[in-house]
Amino acid sequence: MSFVAYEELIKEGDTAILSLGHGAMVAVRVQRGAQTQTRHGVLRHSVDLIGRPFGSKVTCGRGGWVYVLHPTPELWTLNLPHRTQILYSTDIALLTMMLELRPGSVVCESGTGSGSVSHAIIRTIAPTGHLHTVEFHQQRAERAREEFQEHRVGRWVTVLNQDVCRSGFGVSHVADAVFLDIPSPWEAVGHAWDALKVEGGRFCSFSPCIEQVQRTCQALAACGFSELSTLEVLPQVYNVRTVSLPVPDLGARPGPDAAPFRSGTPMKETVGHTGYLTFATKTPG
């Protein structure tokens, strides 16, 4: 099992996502002899998981069933153990596009946190790229390093435990893109400039408050970055249904009493503010 490449059969040591129905999911580490309790009954790893294909429908102890899904960065984001606040797939998709990430890209990131963005970046830049991720908190850095090895993506990532605002990313002039998710990104802008390639690259920072964005933009402009822009992603879900309205009688011949048509109306409850994504470009020179 790898978050980068699909594998058909479940093996010991794999991470599997159990879909329990109605949107409920849980991530489990598959171990021989282990058991997982679900609302549908017990799931025995040796009998019910190991050797089965990913995507299998497995019957639990009480007669209920679950689907065993292959892990992806998107599913991991929804099921990971939270060590910090995380970014979700909507923001991750935008920053991946705006940073122009592709296989072979070299990326510098801070902070690692729970690894939500890290897994998505690794999947995008593999098999020839590399991620340099910096985490200030020692225990979070150690746990992230362990997870990358468990998920078999360790070859594409280097984890450093240091303060990026003081010590930088540990590399110079190698990165195609830099991503910051830290409380004071403006203090790391200079290190981001040094980490990016001499021929240029892309920068992104995530901040929940507009005051953080203002200070970051000032630092970016002072450092020489150009093409500054700040975006906020607010998805709007629409409810589409068929409705019928009465048709007025406008002539001598009788017509239909009502006519159906498709109507789309926005849902009353939508996802609110998560944060601002600020982008900039380091140009050659």
Curated annotation (Swiss-Prot):
N-acetylserine PTM sites in chain numbering? 2
Tell me which UniProt keywords the record has, alphabetically: Acetylation, Methyltransferase, Nucleus, S-adenosyl-L-methionine, Transferase, tRNA processing
Which reactions appear under catalytic activity for this entry?
adenosine(58) in tRNA + S-adenosyl-L-methionine = N(1)-methyladenosine(58) in tRNA + S-adenosyl-L-homocysteine + H(+); an adenosine in mRNA + S-adenosyl-L-methionine = an N(1)-methyladenosine in mRNA + S-adenosyl-L-homocysteine + H(+)
Q: Which residues form a coiled coil?
A: none
Name its cellular compartments. Nucleus
Q: Which Pfam families does the entry mention?
A: GCD14
Which coarse location class applies to the principal site listed for this UniProt protein?
Answer: nucleus
The GO molecular function terms of this record are: mRNA (adenine-N1-)-methyltransferase activity; tRNA (adenine(58)-N1)-methyltransferase activity
Write out the residues that bind S-adenosyl-L-methionine.
87, 114-116, 135, 140, 163-164, 181
Q: Where is this region: Substrate?
A: 20-22, 35-42, 64-65, 85-89, 110-117, 180-183, 205-212
State what this protein does: Catalytic subunit of tRNA (adenine-N(1)-)-methyltransferase, which catalyzes the formation of N(1)-methyladenine at position 58 (m1A58) in initiator methionyl-tRNA. Catalytic subunit of mRNA N(1)-methyltransferase complex, which mediates methylation of adenosine residues at the N(1) position of a small subset of mRNAs: N(1) methylation takes place in tRNA T-loop-like structures of mRNAs and is only present at low stoichiometries.
* Quaternary data: Heterotetramer; composed of two copies of TRMT6 and two copies of TRMT61A.
This chain belongs to the protein called tRNA (adenine(58)-N(1))-methyltransferase catalytic subunit TRMT61A
Query: Native species of this protein?
Result: Bos taurus (Bovine)
